């Protein structure tokens, strides 16, 4: 127990060095995570409860790469305005990590402002069936990107929160963007599972653990992302859900 407390304290102290930006903007909270990588957080309401949605953007020598989007189209312009105000650069690439609005909802907007937009073919198929705006470019489940001097990788670990959820790995920064397949450490349950594959979720998380064991930071898709026990907590939540399901049958 003391060991766990000590580890949590070390992580908390390390994260206090994060530089906060955009506090004056009520639509988006931006925090510098590492080097040129920033976490942005927006807020929306689901089933009467307010939640935070987290994603990241990377400032490169060519422009800004945005993973996912603010949660709610009313925040799109203020978000990109804030980026330009802080960095003097425009968004040149947007990548959606699955088909839900808090991830793919900005594809049309980013395309209109001149950014190249990307999703997996699986996400594109879902968006097409739902008659929603789609990315300009699609790729198979895994893809490596090189933008100027920066590199990162999109990886499909398997089904979990949705059939199409992917994660994004920044090797230089050792940062993993878990998206919604990774639950925050303060999550009480698995959240929305209307499109989830709970029986596949555990193996998918194990795939993430094995492939990115060197991650220094894991950014969960919602709520608290600074507590770095989110991967194990996700596994615990899946196990709890499965046990309850067995007990009720």
Swiss-Prot record:
Q: Which Gene3D superfamilies match?
A: Ribonuclease Z/Hydroxyacylglutathione hydrolase-like (3.60.15.10)
Q: What does this protein do?
A: Confers resistance to the different beta-lactams antibiotics (penicillin, cephalosporin and carbapenem) via the hydrolysis of the beta-lactam ring.
- Which residues belong to the signal peptide in this entry? 1-22
**How does the cofactor bind to this protein, according to its record?**
Binds 2 Zn(2+) ions per subunit.
The question of whether Metal-binding is a record keyword is answered with yes
Q: Gene for this protein?
A: blaB3
Q: Which domain of life is it from?
A: Bacteria
Q: What are the GO cellular component annotations?
A: periplasmic space
**Subcellular location(s) per record:** Periplasm
Q: Which SUPFAM superfamilies match?
A: Metallo-hydrolase/oxidoreductase
What does the record give as cofactor? Zn(2+)
Where along this sequence does the record place binding of substrate?
183
Any single GO BP term: response to antibiotic
* Source species: Elizabethkingia meningoseptica (Chryseobacterium meningosepticum)
What protein am I looking at? Metallo-beta-lactamase type 2
Which residues are Zn(2+) 1-binding?
A: 98, 100, 161
Q: How does it assemble?
A: Monomer.
Alphabetical keyword list: Antibiotic resistance, Hydrolase, Metal-binding, Periplasm, Signal, Zinc
Its Enzyme Commission number(s) read: 3.5.2.6
- Sorted alphabetically, which NCBIfam families does this protein's record hold? bla_class_B_core, bla_subclass_B1, blaB, blaB-IND-MUS
Q: Which reaction does it catalyse?
A: a beta-lactam + H2O = a substituted beta-amino acid
InterPro entries from the entry? Beta-lactamase_class-B_CS (IPR001018), Metallo-B-lactamas (IPR001279), NDM-1-like (IPR050855), RibonucZ/Hydroxyglut_hydro (IPR036866)
Family in the record: Belongs to the metallo-beta-lactamase superfamily. Class-B beta-lactamase family.
Residues where Zn(2+) 2 binds: 102, 180, 222
Q: Which GO terms describe its molecular function?
A: beta-lactamase activity; zinc ion binding
